[in-house]
């Protein structure tokens, strides 16, 4: 394993193909400009790797200029390592910076081993800094600290160090400027600074790392107990002068929050951007030079000056799963201590395959990384290939979070089946928690790896009592325009219809159980996963239930449900009806 590189941290004071954006060089000042020219620093931007050690099963769609798009097979740690190495080559001054969600919501080959191999892969890639994302907290902050520091202390159901008996932790640094402990300190350092060169050619790059303020609503509360997640812009603005005072010539923000360009927007330009990050950036100190973002799983390279002329920084994001990287070149004037120019482009990490697209570069597999991934793949194979049942056909995961699918209904049916003994009448599953399709093998065979990919979080099931009026209020929360709009997948016998054209709070048109309208005064036993039970995804009504009973883990429920029949028929859709515009 590579040795830990020297990192300089600042103390907290007072507590696609070749889509490019380029910032024009600053005007030269003959009295102050170094005749040797600017110092070049290369940065590779990553985000939302999610433990995808192996190439994604499905190709990614790469939007092009003119409204066209191409499907490209991309990703895989061995190919990403090769791409990172290629884009760091040719210069002594380089950094690799990630904007969070390196771990969590991961495929079996990483998640089965508590994402230790995802950390190991990033070590081998030469990652320097990672701004923590919400998924870094999926197993709790203590387990996240273990991933940083190493060791084999157990913080959950699974035993650490199953493959690497001396797991040493991350060679790179986690950054969390807006995550504060009860003691008033940040959970991880908020900033770091990296210096290059010497004498008159010395330059320094300061980095601020942080996650989205809404993280507590996206993870199990026990995992972030005792932590406060502060305002993102305030955290950035408090640290910009610190970095400037420490001699930073360029300031980079890595933040796990993102923009939402219009669907089909090419990777270059801002387009009609939306998303929570925009409002944050409109409040950020203009002295920031570069923002590496994530969370929305979108790809873009945006000159934010086209949105707000007072803020001339570039904002980037490289999709998800290691399928892209952002190549960034900073030209720093060491005499004026400023960024003279900045160029950035997103690169598709096309892997070696039978149907490689000649329009995109192909990256060969890095041999050392391939061997490392193979070690974990072999260790996971016995568990992942174990048959757990059969289904009648392919079951795809939801596209939009409001889409009803047979897979979502299958999961809800399995959860209802597993909790009947607790009196369950209804099961509700959040579509955002369904992470992959289930594509059966020969004869309809489904493996443990298949169901794990679809539900990778290991949530337990909880059954509680709710009044009919609470249940209706819960259904309304799905459609609250102030939050993330998604509909539940629901179990057999339960149905509801909604109309987004109606006023907020009255968008549920009807709801019924076994054909009978929900009675606001009656009591109903409802099953949900432990994430929802704690108010996850903003569903606070779930917390108001009574007479709670804890059930099995969601994967065990699915396995038991599939085992009850030789072949389980996929349930029909039609339980959730969108009446908007009808």
Which stretches of residues belong to each language-model region?
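Short alpha-helical segments used as structural interaction elements across diverse proteins
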Residues: 1-2, 236
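Sec-dependent N-terminal signal peptides
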Residues: 8-14
């Amino acid at each position: 394993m590579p040795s830990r590189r020297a990192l300089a941290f600042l103390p907290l004071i007072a507590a696609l193909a070749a889509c490019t954006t380029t910032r024009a060089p600053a005007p030269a000042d003959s009295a102050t400009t170094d005749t040797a020219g600017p110092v070049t620093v290369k940065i590779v931007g990553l985000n939302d790797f999610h433990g995808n050690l192996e190439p994604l099963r499905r190709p990614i769609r790469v939007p092009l200029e003119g409204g066209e798009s191409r499907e490209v097979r991309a990703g895989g740690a061995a190919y990403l390592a090769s791409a990172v190495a290629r884009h760091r080559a040719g210069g002594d001054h380089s950094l690799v910076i990630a904007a969070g969600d390196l771990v969590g919501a991961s495929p079996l080959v990483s998640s089965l081993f508590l994402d230790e191999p995802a950390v190991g892969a990033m070590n081998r890639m030469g990652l320097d800094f990672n701004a923590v994302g919400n998924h870094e907290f999926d197993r709790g902050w203590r387990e996240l600290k273990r991933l940083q520091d190493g060791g084999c202390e157990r913080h959950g159901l699974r035993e650490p160090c199953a493959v690497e008996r001396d797991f040493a932790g991350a060679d790179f640094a986690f950054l969390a400027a807006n995550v504060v402990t009860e003691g008033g300190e940040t959970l991880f350092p908020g900033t770091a600074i990296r210096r290059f060169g010497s004498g008159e050619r010395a330059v320094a790059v300061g980095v601020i790392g942080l996650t989205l303020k809404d993280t507590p609503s996206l993870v199990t509360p026990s995992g972030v107990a005792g932590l406060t997640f502060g305002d993102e812009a305030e955290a950035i603005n408090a640290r910009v002068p610190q970095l400037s005072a420490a001699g930073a010539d360029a300031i980079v923000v890595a933040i796990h929050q993102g923009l939402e360009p219009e669907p089909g927007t090419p990777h270059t330009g801002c387009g009609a951007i939306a998303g929570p990050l925009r409002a944050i950036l409109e409040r950020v100190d203009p002295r920031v030079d570069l923002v590496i973002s994530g969370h929305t799983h979108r790809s873009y390279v945006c000159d934010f000056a086209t949105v707000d002329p007072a803020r001339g920084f570039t904002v980037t994001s490289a999709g998800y799963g290691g399928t892209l990287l952002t190549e960034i070149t900073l030209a720093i004037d060491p005499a004026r201590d400023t960024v003279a120019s900045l160029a950035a482009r997103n690169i598709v990490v096309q892997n070696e395959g039978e149907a490689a697209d000649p329009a995109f570069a192909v990256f060969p597999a890095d041999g050392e990384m391939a061997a490392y991934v193979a070690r974990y793949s072999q260790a996971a194979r016995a568990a992942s290939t174990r048959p757990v049942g059969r289904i009648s056909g392919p079951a795809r995961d939801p596209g939009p979070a409001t889409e009803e699918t047979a897979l979502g209904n299958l999961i809800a049916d399995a959860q209802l089946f597993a909790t009947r003994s607790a009196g369950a009448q209804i099961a509700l599953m959040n579509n955002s928690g369904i992470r992959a399709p289930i594509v059966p093998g020969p004869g309809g065979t489904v493996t443990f790896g298949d169901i794990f990919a679809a539900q990778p979080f290991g949530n337990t099931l909880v059954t509680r009592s709710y009044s009919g009026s609470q249940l209706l209020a819960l259904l309304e929360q799905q459609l609250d325009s102030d939050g993330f709009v998604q509909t539940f997948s629901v179990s057999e016998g339960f149905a509801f219809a909604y109309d987004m054209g109606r006023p907020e709070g009255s968008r549920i048109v009807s709801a019924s159980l076994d054909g009978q309208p929900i009675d606001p005064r009656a009591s109903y036993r409802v099953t949900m996963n432990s994430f929802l039970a704690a108010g996850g995804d903003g569903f606070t009504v779930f917390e108001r239930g009574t007479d709670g009973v804890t059930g099995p883990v969601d994967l065990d429920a699915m396995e038991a449900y599939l085992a009850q029949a030789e072949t389980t028929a996929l349930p029909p859709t039609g339980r959730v009806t969108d009446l908007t515009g009808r």
